[in-house]
Structure formats: structure tokens, C-alpha cells
Amino acid sequence: MLRALCGATIFTLALSAHAALDIGEAAPDFSAQAALGGKVYRFSLAESLRKGPVVVYFFPAAYSEGCSVEAHYFAEAIAQFEAMGASVIGVSGDDIATLSKFSVQACQSKFPVASDEGQAVIGAFDARMPTRPEYANRLSYVIAPDGKILYYYVSLNPGKHVENTLGAVRAWRQTK
């Protein structure tokens, strides 16, 4: 029994630690329908990178408990990201109507969330959940203004995504 439990734990940890885009690799450019404060617009990663680093965080589904908690944490920390010249966007496979509401409620109208119903962006960033590929994994990337991956963090637990991405932006900022 103990051996099976240890094996399952190691397998789970291996799955949660996977991300195909390595630090220093070019992030895939994308544009997508997004919502900020209930207003729908076209988000462009290239445009956002002209202003500074971008945190692109993927989440499984709007209004699920962990995703709502994570959005709340990012909303509470958005002023800290902005103070360092960084912006944040969440991405999921939810439709834009759902994300439009989510952008007001969970995101508190403080940052946009993008719809990737066809999962093109999720696939390009290797952000599919290994055990449920119809959902995005909880995966956060920090992308430098030159389009290179500075940092990534994978964990289904939403608790450390904000803290870790803030730390990565702060570390990048100190080199500038």
C-alpha cells in the first residue's frame, strides 16, 4: 500500500512539474478575445510586451474554486505587478461570455482574461492538463519584453502562482 501511494505521489509530482517551454525560449505570440471589466476586446501579447513583462497564467475553468481563488489573488496583487511595469492576463478554454462575467466578479475588473475555446494558445504554451486535456493546466509564465520566457510555475494549488510570478518579475526588474 505504501509503495503504491509513493508511486502515485511521484507520478503526480512529475505531471505537475511539466512545462515544455523552457526559460530563455521564445514564447509563442498570440492574440485572442479577452475581457476586462466585462468589456470584450482583442488582446495581443506582442502589444502588451511593448509595455513591459507579461504574466500569462493558464487556469482550468472560470468559477471553479481554485480558479476563482487564483483570480482573486492576482487581482489583489495587480498594483504590485503594475509598479514594476508588468501586466497580467489569464487564459482558459472558457467562452468569452463566461469570461466577461468572470473578469468583473473574480478578477475584480483589474486584469483581463482571454478565451481560448479552440485551445490553440493552450497547446502552443504546452498548458494542457495532463490528466484532463480538455482543460488548461494551472501554469504561469513570466515573459520578458523581448518575448523570452523568464520563469514558469506549474501547480494545481493556486496559492503560490502570484507570489512566484511577482518574485520573477522583481528579479528581472533588478537586472534592468
Language-model region placement:
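A short beta-strand-turn-helix
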Residues: 31-53
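Structural micro-motif
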Residues: 109-111, 128-141
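Short active-site neighborhood of thiol/selenol oxidoreductases, capturing the structured segment around
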Residues: 45-72
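Structural microenvironment flanking redox-active thiols in thiol-disulfide oxidoreductases
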Residues: 68-107, 119-121
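N-proximal helix/coil linker or "cap" segments that precede and/or mark the start of modular domains
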Residues: 11-34
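Thiol-/selenol-based redox modules, centered on thioredoxin-like
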Residues: 135-176
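Bacterial N-terminal signal peptides that target proteins for export
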Residues: 1-6
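Short loop/turn microsegments at loop-to-beta-strand junctions
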Residues: 28, 53, 137-139
